[in-house]
Amino acid sequence: MKIGIIAAMPEELKLLVEHLEMAKKHQRLGHVYHTGRIGHHEVVLVESGIGKVMSAMSVAVLVNDFKVTAVINTGSAGAVASGLEIGDVVVADRLAYHDVDVTAFGYDYGQMARQPLYYEASRYLVEEMKAV
């Protein structure tokens, strides 16, 4: 399994880049993609920039150009919850938009038109992450 790891800001990716073995750099669409290994995992690291559009663009490159089979978002992931400390790991089993409101058209808050309210995470990856 090749894992893509995406972070919005350099501070969120720095430690992972420092631990990357057999590291190579690749330029794509104005971003640097770092390939190599962390432990026994083949990984591709990228600082996407902040926001859903930047993140989506970087994930598209990870999937299309680098053929990753899983993507992990590292960093604050767009939110800071009380009670969480630096280094805590949050594993989501489902995700939803926090900034979408088309309730005037009969959708639930957080649901994009003609899309599910929740996006389910891979059960396999959730269980693997919980086992660590």
Feature names for model-found ranges:
Residues M1-F66, Y97:
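N-terminal short beta-loop-beta anion/metal-coordinating cradle
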Residues E12-K14, G78-A81:
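Short, active-site-adjacent cap segments at secondary-structure transitions
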Residues V80-V132:
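Mid-sequence, gly/pro-rich, charge-dense loop/helix-turn segments that line enzyme active sites
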Residues V68-I72:
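Proline-aspartate-enriched helix->loop->beta-strand connector
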